[in-house]
Amino acid sequence: MTADELRRIAYQVPFKPFRVRLASGEQLEIARTLRTTVAEDRAIFGVDEDPQTRVARRMRMVPLREIVSVEVAA
């Protein structure tokens, strides 16, 4: 996945939740806008959302080369 491809998904208006599948088999659920920052070779995702505060509990820095696919919710 390229930085531009991920930016198009992460910053689309209106925002649509998406799932990032990593080479390790791990999946990251991105449910809200402004939870993703994309650089040229990596992305930072806000994950593990607190259901009461709706704040991400952790940040994950992922090299783009480790992203196998991204699925956008319908």
Indicate residue ranges for each PLM-predicted region.
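Motif-centric detector for short Cys/His coordination patterns
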Residues: 1-74
